């Protein structure tokens, strides 16, 4: 059984929902290409700086902007923070794999971390949370969910091959 935990911002906990539904035998929107025994240990939606500090237990870098305590980073910082989130939630939930997502300005950061491997990618859609364009924000979210689950599948294949 592979244990997975998520700490999500721009994907709004939807990566966790997809993983849980798949693990229980009723996949939602994602077309899974693997067969693996997974369990979602925890799925956290953490868009704020205070959530990162108080729940994930680390001090995040200073964002370019904040909107009601919601962190707004550039793409490079999003990648860094997503990896920090993935590592922190993996430790917090005592899981095999942690997933972190965050997006402010740009394509966002999507990170997956195990004890000995990590990777960071982006969505395929650029958006800017400071000047919300609902359609672009939702397109970026959809792309981020898809890309996170694809990356998880590659991790699981590698995990099972060990």
Curated annotation (Swiss-Prot):
Disulfide bonds: none annotated. InterPro entries: HcgF. Belongs to the UPF0254 family. This is UPF0254 protein MTH1148 homolog. It comes from Methanothermobacter thermautotrophicus (strain Winter) (Methanobacterium thermoautotrophicum).
């Amino acid at each position: 059984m592979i244990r997975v935990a998520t700490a999500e911002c721009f994907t709004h906990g939807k990566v966790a929902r997809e993983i849980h539904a798949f693990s229980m035998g009723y996949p939602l929107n994602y077309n899974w290409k693997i067969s693996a025994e997974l369990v979602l240990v925890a799925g956290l939606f953490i868009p704020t700086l205070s959530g990162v500090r108080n729940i994930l237990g680390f001090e995040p870098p200073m964002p370019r902007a904040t909107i009601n305590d919601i962190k707004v980073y550039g793409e490079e910082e999003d990648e860094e923070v997503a990896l920090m989130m993935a590592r922190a939630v993996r430790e917090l939930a005592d899981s095999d794999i942690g997933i972190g997502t965050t997006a402010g300005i740009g394509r966002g950061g999507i990170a997956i971390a195990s004890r000995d491997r990590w990777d960071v990618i982006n969505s395929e859609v650029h958006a800017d949370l400071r000047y919300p364009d609902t359609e672009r924000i939702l397109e970026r979210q959809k792309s981020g969910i898809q890309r996170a689950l694809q990356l998880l599948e590659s991790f699981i294949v590698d995990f099972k091959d060990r």
